[in-house]
Amino acid sequence: MKVVFMGTPEFAVASLDAINKVHEVVGVVTVADKKAGRGKKIRYSAVKDFAIENNLTLLQPEKLKNEEFVNVLKELNADLFVVVAFRMLPEVIWNIPSKGTINLHGSLLPDYRGAAPLNWAIINGDTTTGATTFFIEKEIDTGNIIDQVEIEITENMNVGELHDSLMFKGADLLVQTINKIDQGKAIVTPQAELITDRIKEAPKIFKDTCQIDW
């Protein structure tokens, strides 16, 4: 199946690598290059580094609604778009592929919708979390669920360790999901069917959030 992959950090690279081994990645979308550090040197995203190393078609739009970028995506004629740790997509983008656009999220949705699901699972003292694949819709992290995988949060596990574990578990889950979609075997569950009580939230982490009340 032809796939366009969208992602930025190291977390996304494991998924791109896994997908590239079993499906045709016809395009990779990542953030535009930015200057960073004291020397203000250009730094590539981890996903860009992987795309270059593996000779994959690379796109780095400044604006996702740019007409030229949208047309290039359409010309790639991908069956499916896959999103891992990227920006919120406008409908004009996620509506392009015939089989839809899916996202990998680092929680067991509908819990921990938002930007920092791993952090909040640790902060709240959860003993389990996981990853979810779902179809992207207008509202962020609310689309129909396709697959989930659960992972234990051990007593002394930190966010970095949880990140690394979910990075690979999530990549395997994503390939499983793509295979199901390719074979016409994907069965979805609306998130509304899973909400029985107040759901946990995962807003962006700020400095104030990190203050400890001794």
Region roles according to the model:
Residues 38-42, 113, 157:
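Residues at secondary-structure transition points
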Residues 62-132, 136-138, 142:
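Alpha-helical oligomerization interface recognition
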Residues 7, 28, 51, 81, ...:
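A residue-level signal for conserved active-site and pocket-lining positions in enzyme catalytic cores
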Residues 35-79:
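N-terminal glycine-/serine-/threonine-rich beta1-alpha1-beta2 phosphate-ribose binding loop
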Residues 138-214:
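Active-site-proximal loop/hinge segments within enzyme catalytic domains
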Residues 1-39:
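N-terminal Rossmann-like dinucleotide-binding module
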Residues 21, 54, 96-97:
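Short, structured coil segments at secondary-structure junctions
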